[in-house]
Amino acid sequence: MSIDLEAIQEMWEKDSKIDRDNLHEESLNIPSLHAKYFELYNTIFLLRKKAEQQRKNIRHERYEYFSGKSDPEVYVENPFPKKIRDKDTMQKYLDADEKLSNTSLKIDYYDTMLVYLESILKVIQNRTYQIKNAIEFMRFNSGLG
């Protein structure tokens, strides 16, 4: 199963709706909703950790490459005529490196997903109060409040 932000948004679009005619069922459904989105949160969190480690590995690999310290075979496949020694220049090359920036973008994407899932989990935690308020409002409207 491929998890992306759009899929999570579509799931939440369906799950966020509260059926006013079945508030008791909606109330009982809160724990399973929480479990569903908390599992997604944990999965994305671990994927982010993995991507963070990949970024560190790629950064080290690219640092070695740009400084001329990689295995000679690497330069046969992908020649790089310079040996960068200056720290500022090295940082510029690392910032512009496609492999490294792709991994950084992946981490940023995971961060966006995590923020979205955190907001969903907060809404789910408050759902009990929303349902309670809806019930009290119905009682009030029917003259029982």
Q: Residues of each region from the PLM?
A:
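Charge-rich amphipathic alpha-helical interaction elements
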Residues: M1-G145
